[in-house]
């Protein structure tokens, strides 16, 4: 019971922060699971990805009902992402824990930079059409699928800016496409992690409802709080956490 309560709180906090600044909860959930529950880095990545697939379904349904989605674009991204997500999960499994921690730290710093640049992304719209747009979407799936499987995150942090900048897709539609595309891709990555023994299933009972509630609360609060201040504070926290991970010492 105590473990379920702790995992619920971790999911809740991850969802709130993710909802506040428009990020998936994985970048918060993984450090919390490693720090509070003393989880192995590999298991934290696998468990996070499983939980995020469930919350991605809810988000995709919401965006679909609002009409902010492009099913064809989602299919194109998922077509390549389902293959690379499996490769990413296997690559993470093959890495020593200290190397995976360093890689995750670098990813957190990269995410923080994207977070700070977020207000300016919608003003740099690309104009790819036809075959070029298809190639952009397929290529986006290749990179974000691998990243999702390796880092245990949804991949939208990178996927959405890529679609906005390179394919000329609107911000809200890009977010909906990202959520829908990562259901099959994230599912493949999550299943691969589970097969490799990198999923702590008993934590999911608390994590999944916690993220659901937290994302809803975070999204609601986001409209009441100044966006710029939230992004800067969260980016600072991510950079600090990222540098701590990057400085993980190699075993002697």
Describe each region flagged by the PLM.
Residues 30-31, 160-161, 184, 226-227:
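Proline-centered helix-kink/hinge sites
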Residues 45, 172-179:
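Small-residue hotspots at the loop-to-helix junctions and early N-terminal turns
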Residues 50-58, 183-187, 213-214:
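Membrane-embedded alpha-helical segments of transport systems
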Residues 22-30, 151-162:
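Transmembrane helix boundary and interhelical junction motifs in multipass membrane proteins
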Residues 51, 76-77, 177, 181, ...:
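Transmembrane alpha-helical segments of major facilitator superfamily
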Residues 1-15, 35-36, 41, 61-150, ...:
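Juxtamembrane transmembrane-helix boundary motif
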């Amino acid at each position: 019971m105590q473990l379920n309560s702790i995992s619920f709180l971790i999911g809740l906090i991850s969802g709130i922060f993710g909802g506040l600044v428009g990020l998936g909860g994985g970048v918060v959930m993984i450090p919390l699971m490693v720090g509070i529950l003393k989880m192995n880095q590999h298991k934290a990545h696998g468990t996070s990805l499983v939980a995020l697939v469930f919350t991605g379904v809810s988000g995709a349904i919401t965006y679909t009902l609002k009409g902010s989605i492009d099913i064809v674009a989602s299919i194109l991204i998922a077509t390549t992402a389902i293959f690379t997500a499996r490769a990413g999960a296997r690559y993470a499994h093959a890495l020593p824990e200290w190397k995976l921690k360093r890689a995750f730290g670098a990813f957190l710093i990269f995410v923080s930079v994207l977070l700070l640049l977020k207000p300016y992304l919608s003003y740099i719209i690309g104009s790819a059409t036809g075959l070029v747009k298809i190639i952009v979407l397929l290529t986006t799936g290749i990179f974000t699928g691998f990243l999702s499987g390796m880092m245990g995150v949804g991949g939208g942090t990178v996927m959405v800016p890529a679609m906005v900048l390179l394919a000329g897709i609107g911000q809200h539609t890009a977010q909906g496409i990202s959520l829908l595309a990562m259901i099959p891709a994230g599912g493949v990555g999550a299943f691969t992690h589970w097969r490799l023994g990198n999923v702590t299933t008993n934590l999911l009972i608390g994590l999944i409802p916690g993220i659901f509630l937290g994302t809803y609360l975070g999204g609601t609060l986001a409209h009441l709080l100044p966006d710029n201040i939230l992004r800067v504070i969260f980016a600072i926290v991510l950079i600090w956490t990222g540098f701590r991970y990057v400085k993980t010492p190699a075993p002697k």
